[in-house]
Amino acid sequence: MDLAAVILAAGRGTRMKSKLPKVLHRVCGRPMLSYIVNAVAAAGIKKIVVVAGYGAEQVAREVEGLAQVALQAEQLGTAHALLQAGPFLSGFAGKVLVLCGDTPLIEAGTLAKLAGFHRTAGAAATLLTAEPDDPAGYGRVIRDGRGNVIKIVEEKDASPAEKLIREINTGIYCFEAAGLFDALKGIRPANAQGEYYLTDIVEIYVRAGLAVAAFKLENPVEVTGINDRRQLAEVEKYLRRRVLEDLMQSGVTVLDPASTFVDGTVRVGRDTVIYPFTFLEGSTIIGEDCVIGPGSRLVNAVVGNGVSVQNSVVIESQIGDCCSIGPFAYLRPETRLGRNVKVGDFVEIKKSVIGDGSKVPHLSYVGDATVGAGVNIGCGTITCNYDGRNKWPTRIGDGAFIGSNTNLVAPVEIGAGAVTGAGSTITKNVPDGALAVERARQVLVPDWAAKKRDKKV
């Protein structure tokens, strides 16, 4: 293909007031830069150069294997940034798309249309322009009396009359590679900011008699830039709505989209119902016929079919088919549940395997444990897995019955079909089918309470 792309991602984004490079702030679960890289790749462009500056090492890690990285050591403006990509495009004679790294809503189809229009127009440069309802903050496209583009004026340098123009420069261009980098070297910082503006290349081309075309975008939302946290929230809201609409179109019921938050990387099966105030994040996968929420958060979780998760938190865990979770359960990383497992209210499970049909109904902690199939873990059971230095395992065999308020002091094994008496502290292994009881014998003193009251009188 005769297309290459350069993504300008060197700015710090001072208005974000963050230590993190602006382009790495997450939108709907992914760094905003990843949206632009993916859109470029989806448009069929294989040669991609990302120009990084502030936080360049972090940016490079994000695009590793997807793009080459050019370094802009000193942030001297967009023209200077594009110039840093020159060595990576040495000998390239095709067309160069130039994009900003802070416009995550841009779509691959728009980039393909821009490139196609540029070819048809036979121009040296083509601008992607738009007419938003509020053009404030954007550079204005200046045309002559015949409608030809003659220059772009940044808003900070625009006159009052120029600020009334609604057509804006989106910061996305298509250039002929031939002559581009020579023209960039001719740009001077003759503006209020003392920076080398890429927009000045339009006047250079016009003075040289080279054609500059403009392709107007139908949906200005695509080029919404993110410069501060407020704009980040606006784009997040827009993208989340789009994600939820896609889910609903695929057969998922979202009871209240306004209070449901699903990352773009999440997959949900049909006939699943998502209740309000549910957060599905990261690489979470939800099966079919599930009920998720209300008030639940799942992060990088894998959930089977027919599962209920109510008012619970599930982090990096796997849940088998037909399980019931919650309310108010907490599944911590590396937890794996088999089929038909019940994890009830106020139960915390960490780094444990729970077998098919087992139940942990309420008020229990299970950590570093392997629990077999058909096990019942009574209310208030605790696996005492930490001795102050090390975490120790607990193993419970198939069909075991753990009485309420049992303390299992790890390392310890409970055999298949074994039973522990309520209130026991188990420190030794229990054989298959055995009963283990460890508690003080009950003492009964008749009439003790009345005598105690009489003494107080």
Curated annotation (Swiss-Prot):
Keywords, A to Z?
Acyltransferase, Cell shape, Cell wall biogenesis/degradation, Cytoplasm, Magnesium, Metal-binding, Multifunctional enzyme, Nucleotidyltransferase, Peptidoglycan synthesis, Repeat, Transferase
Task: Please give the Pfam families that the UniProt record associates with this protein.
Answer: Hexapep, NTP_transferase
InterPro entries found in the cross-reference section: Bifunctional_GlmU, GlmU-like, GlmU_C_LbH, Hexapep, NTP_transferase_dom, Nucleotide-diphossugar_trans, Trimer_LpxA-like_sf
Question: Where in the cell?
Answer: Cytoplasm
Give the region (N-acetyltransferase) as residue ranges. 251-457
Under catalytic activity, the entry for this protein gives:
alpha-D-glucosamine 1-phosphate + acetyl-CoA = N-acetyl-alpha-D-glucosamine 1-phosphate + CoA + H(+); N-acetyl-alpha-D-glucosamine 1-phosphate + UTP + H(+) = UDP-N-acetyl-alpha-D-glucosamine + diphosphate
Any GO molecular function: glucosamine-1-phosphate N-acetyltransferase activity
Q: What does the record give as cofactor?
A: Mg(2+)
- Annotated residues that bind acetyl-CoA are located at 385-386, 404, 422, 439
What pathway does the annotation place this protein in? Answer: Nucleotide-sugar biosynthesis; UDP-N-acetyl-alpha-D-glucosamine biosynthesis; N-acetyl-alpha-D-glucosamine 1-phosphate from alpha-D-glucosamine 6-phosphate (route II): step 2/2; Nucleotide-sugar biosynthesis; UDP-N-acetyl-alpha-D-glucosamine biosynthesis; UDP-N-acetyl-alpha-D-glucosamine from N-acetyl-alpha-D-glucosamine 1-phosphate: step 1/1; Bacterial outer membrane biogenesis; LPS lipid A biosynthesis
Q: Give the record's cofactor note, including how many are bound.
A: Binds 1 Mg(2+) ion per subunit.
Query: Where UDP-N-acetyl-alpha-D-glucosamine is bound, by residue?
Result: 8-11, 22, 72, 77-78, 139, 154, 169, 227, 332, 350, 365, 376
Q: Which EC class is this protein assigned?
A: transferase
Segments of this protein annotated with the region Linker: 230-250
Which biological process, per GO, is one annotated for this protein? peptidoglycan biosynthetic process
What's the Enzyme Commission number for this chain? Answer: 2.7.7.23, 2.3.1.157
Task: Please list where the region (Pyrophosphorylase) is annotated.
Answer: 1-229
Question: Which superkingdom heads the taxonomic lineage of this protein's source?
Answer: Bacteria
Active site positions? 362
Q: Which residues bind Mg(2+)?
A: 102, 227
Stored Gene3D superfamilies: Hexapeptide repeat proteins, Spore Coat Polysaccharide Biosynthesis Protein SpsA, Chain A
The Gene Ontology CC terms held by the record are: cytoplasm; membrane
- Which family does the record assign? In the N-terminal section; belongs to the N-acetylglucosamine-1-phosphate uridyltransferase family.
Assembly:
Homotrimer.
**Function comment:** Catalyzes the last two sequential reactions in the de novo biosynthetic pathway for UDP-N-acetylglucosamine (UDP-GlcNAc). The C-terminal domain catalyzes the transfer of acetyl group from acetyl coenzyme A to glucosamine-1-phosphate (GlcN-1-P) to produce N-acetylglucosamine-1-phosphate (GlcNAc-1-P), which is converted into UDP-GlcNAc by the transfer of uridine 5-monophosphate (from uridine 5-triphosphate), a reaction catalyzed by the N-terminal domain.
- Which named protein is this? Bifunctional protein GlmU
Q: What is the lineage of its organism?
A: Bacteria, Bacillati, Bacillota, Clostridia, Eubacteriales
